[in-house]
Amino acid sequence: MKFCIEIEGAAVGGIGVHPGEDVHRHTATVGYWLGEEFWGRGIMTEAVTVVTDFCFENFPLRRISAEVFANNPASARVLEKAGFPFEGCLKNDVLKDGKLLDSLLYARTT
């Protein structure tokens, strides 16, 4: 399920929830992006909160998780403010622009 974040008729970001399968069917992951000029306004914190609340209320989910690059503390703060506790660090998890980066794992449960 994917949602557009719209401000004054313009798409400025997006958020998506991707359900797990089989033994993970009670879980989902959330991912998001927001145009840089809209950073620091609480827009994404509100979007993550509203979308995860909606998912917990309307689907048989018990856990929604998200991963952020370790070098993106603003995105980690979005998750923390939306009620996602930090669960751990995934070392050398992603290869971005030729560099290995750690990912930080956050999750909200019912």
Q: Which residues does each PLM region occupy?
A:
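Acyl-donor (CoA/ACP) binding surface of acyl/acetyltransferases
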Residues: 2-110
